[in-house]
Amino acid sequence: MSFFNIVIAILAFGVLILIHELGHFVLAKLNDVKVEEFAIGMGPKLLGIKGKETQYSIRALPIGGYVKMLGDESKSDDPRAFNNKSSARRLSIVIAGPIMNLILAAVLFCIVGMSEGIALPTVGKISANSPAQKIGIKAGDTIVKINNYSVHTWEDISFNMALNKGEGIKLALKNNGTIKKVTLVPQYSKKEKMYLIGISPKFIDKPTIIEGAKYGTSETVTMIKTVYLSLKMMVTGKASAKDVSGPVSIIKVTGAAANAGFIRLVNFIAFISAQLGVMNLLPIPALDGGFVFLFLFQMITGKKVDDDKVGFVNTIGFALLMILMIVVTIKDVVYPINF
């Protein structure tokens, strides 16, 4: 793992943290909440600038960041305190961070699509004597479902194919307004080291800004579905803990993406940004999603949960997340990704 990889990874992750925390910061200001500190990084402070009422700082450990608001950890009687705002206002502040990451992902995917062209979920070419040709799939067929999962991008197809172990695949194809359903068994490719059905996508070489924006949005939706499907596979035992990547693997992959070119790096940052946005929305204590769940509960039931109890649960949740980070870091060392 080179020094270059580490620097690129820190800079890339720093951008993701900045955008995420900026979402919290802007919504806090819009809701007239006093922000005491805006920090990029955790741990000891390296640099700091004091604004009118907010301390802006860069900290030593590039593993996160935070927006410290008056009344977000302890009660305050100040009307500008976070704890004195309505559940709806607090919800808007908390959810803004993950949403900003998803917006960033969509913008970056749009840039990638505009730069490299867009692979559509439509068949462009078919390999001779392939399962696709034998079953009657034709160029121009658009794949709308694969194994009952809706398809919006070519990556939806690629993800499902990457998981295939030689089992039959159900496809729903659309052509000229007609839907056709087929089932085919993929063939193993020694070259690609995976099972394939023998199709390649139709490309838009020079997409318009509208097509690029649509691609960016669709690609982000695909990433959201991929994260939740991956989590489902982990919970049901269909995926191994070895497949979980930690900081070491992310640094390696970021470096490899940078070496492959600027657009590849942008694509990977978009991928991580989408993942960061989705993972932060999980209803887990100490994550934004835990607060989203809490504030929605309070809005629906009209009942306020004791702040001290919330603080205790979040402290436990944060400790468990730190333990998980240590575990996946150790896993990265024991089961490293090699290039």
Swiss-Prot record:
GO terms for cellular component: plasma membrane. GO terms for biological process: proteolysis. Its EC number is 3.4.24.-. Belongs to the peptidase M50B family. Signal peptide: none annotated. It comes from Clostridium acetobutylicum (strain ATCC 824 / DSM 792 / JCM 1419 / IAM 19013 / LMG 5710 / NBRC 13948 / NRRL B-527 / VKM B-1787 / 2291 / W). It is a multi-pass membrane protein. The chain crosses the membrane at residues 91-113, 275-297, 310-330. Keywords: Cell membrane, Hydrolase, Membrane, Metal-binding, Metalloprotease, Protease, Transmembrane, Transmembrane helix, Zinc. Residues 99-177 form the PDZ domain. The active site is at 21. Zn(2+) binds at residues 20, 24. Gene3D superfamilies: 2.30.42.10. This is Putative zinc metalloprotease CA_C1796. It is an enzyme of class 3 (hydrolase). PROSITE patterns: ZINC_PROTEASE. It is found in: Cell membrane. Coiled coil: none annotated. GO terms for molecular function: metal ion binding; metalloendopeptidase activity. Its cofactor is Zn(2+).
